Amino acid sequence: MPTTHDWINNPLGVVDGLFAQSNSSPDWEKKVVEYFKEKLKLNDAHTWVPSLNDVPLHYLKPNSLVKFRCMVQDMFDPEFFMGVYEMNDPTSNSKQVKCGKYKDVTECGQVDFNSRNTVTSERQTFYCVPIPGESNWVKESYAGTSQARVVPSTSYVPNRHKRSYEEDDEMDTQCQQTKDISQGAQSSSESHGNTEPKRQETEAPSQDSSSSHCTSSLDLNFPLPGEKGPACLVKVYEDWDSFKLNDMLEVFGILSVDPALSVIADEREASSLLDPTEGMETMEEQRVHSPPASLVPRLHMLYAQPLAHNNPLLPSSPLENNADYLSCVLGELASVRAELLTFFTHILMGDSLAAEFLILHLISNVYSRRDVLPLGKFTLNLSGCPLSSPFTEHLFKVIQQLVPSSYRLSMSLHNMNTQRMVPRKDYTANRLVSGTLQLAKNTSLFLDETQLEQGQLDSTGVRNITALGNLISWQKVDYDFNYHQMEFPCNINVLIASEGRSLLPSDCQVHLRASLNPPNLEEYLSAVQVAQVPSQLNKYRVYLSVARALNYTISDEITKAVEEDFVDMRKDDPQSMSAEDLHRLLVVARLLSLSHGQNTLSRDGWMKAKQLEALRISRTQQQKCVNGNEP
């Protein structure tokens, strides 16, 4: 059996070994997946696996086991590959049956395309990017817990990347790798009766070099501007229907960075006669779907763990499965909440009411949907933010320090009129072009409306404002497929910072009422941030993630009491409490309970929620009287 680290350094050896033992039994594929799942369960075995998120690609050994924390940005068409093929060995004049799974190119030798042992299989390709807006503290924490032993690969270095697809003459002296694998897979698929026209991998290296891939700029299609990190083509072999667009995953797979992959597009163009479906691909589609492996490596998925969150300070498994951990955290919850409330009060210049609602906003979560109505969302409009000051920038930095993923959108006229927010389908390249609103669940989106100046919104700006409004109201983004729009549900925490009431809808408006007036606002806000030591920040990070993940119920007794209370309030003043007001009050009560670590609503919690909401409404009405013209 493989030694301790053989399954990390040489996973293909494990795969080939299990394939050889199978004697053509179809169960061998399940055994491969189970083998690696069991290995990753041992102690902290997952920390031994190098991560593409924090290890440079040229430090990773080709065909080794790696992991990648990512979001599914796009899903390409299914493709065929040779799952099993037979090789002719001219030296020994013998034949060997080989496994083609988890590989992009065949081994050296001659493939017998007429062999009855050939099996054509199908796989799906996901285009995956790092989780958009992931905070630096998250990346550093994940990297800090890694126990992977990584040394620079001698067979795959940056110079080698460039040479391999530009001017590498050594390719002429290397063994001739099979160029006709696509033709063999095509004829094999025909013999198996697969006539559905699907894109089929050529999977053949070219001995002629081309610099087209390096001279043309490659758009890695990150949703957020300025993002960095690796993008991957993840090859999925089983249960690909269980994955959805925008899912957060931690993928464990076999890294494929063969230089041959960098010229597949050129080879396809030259060999399009071998497969009619190849000729149907445009040059742009080939460029997008077969980028240089040195820039977009391939990752053959063995196992993928859906991520409920990307907070490295919490267990990756659901909290209900970690009773001891949850009990420990809940024991400290009250004190941590009080400290966080004080911290937010200082950041909000002495406004403790706004600090309360900021906590409720940050732990809000769409926990269910009733028809089209998302339940649990709590978009906060923090009005009264000073213009031409560093306040909103510092407020976002504070949030960025506490949540795993976030993004600040400056709502300047230029950004509104030029930024692509809604993803759209590019039919020429056959890919989904990302937009700012293609975000993973539980991302904090900070909309800075104080940057919006007077001017005219063009058609793009109007579409962007509409998209933001739909995101806030319905927690959905309508992706643009040219001839139609397709709804994609989301779960995004939206905070709007504005001077007056926001032009966008919100679930709750709190007008900032500062009781502090520091002579130098920037110095004051910086000092408040610096005063928080890392251990204290970690407590806040755990608190917010745990409170968000807690289950919540309302007993029949409390439900009846709330209904009676609602009837009484309507009797006194029918205009004082609408059904919408009651819904918001119930959301506040839910979040207030969870913020105190209580997973059910009590009478005391209901009364506190009513008091908190009464204070907020009173302040909002006072502000309307002051402004006069504010809606």
Swiss-Prot record:
Residues 148-157, 173-192 have a biased composition (Polar residues). Keywords: Cell cycle, Cell division, DNA replication, Mitosis, Nucleus. Residues 193-202 have a biased composition (Basic and acidic residues). Its main location: nucleus. Residues 206-217 have a biased composition (Low complexity). Pfam families: MCM_bind (PF09739). One of its GO terms (biological process) is sister chromatid cohesion. One of its GO terms (cellular component) is nucleus. One of its GO terms (molecular function) is chromatin binding. Disulfide bonds: none annotated. It is found in: Nucleus. Residues 148-218 are annotated as: Disordered. Belongs to the MCMBP family. Interacts with the mcm complex: associates with the mcm3-7 complex which lacks mcm2, while it does not interact with the mcm complex when mcm2 is present (mcm2-7 complex). PANTHER family: MINI-CHROMOSOME MAINTENANCE COMPLEX-BINDING PROTEIN. Associated component of the mcm complex that acts as a regulator of DNA replication. Binds to the MCM complex during late S phase and promotes the disassembly of the mcm complex from chromatin, thereby acting as a key regulator of pre-replication complex (pre-RC) unloading from replicated DNA. Can dissociate the mcm complex without addition of ATP; probably acts by destabilizing interactions of each individual subunits of the mcm complex. Required for sister chromatid cohesion. This is Mini-chromosome maintenance complex-binding protein. It comes from Danio rerio (Zebrafish). The gene is mcmbp.
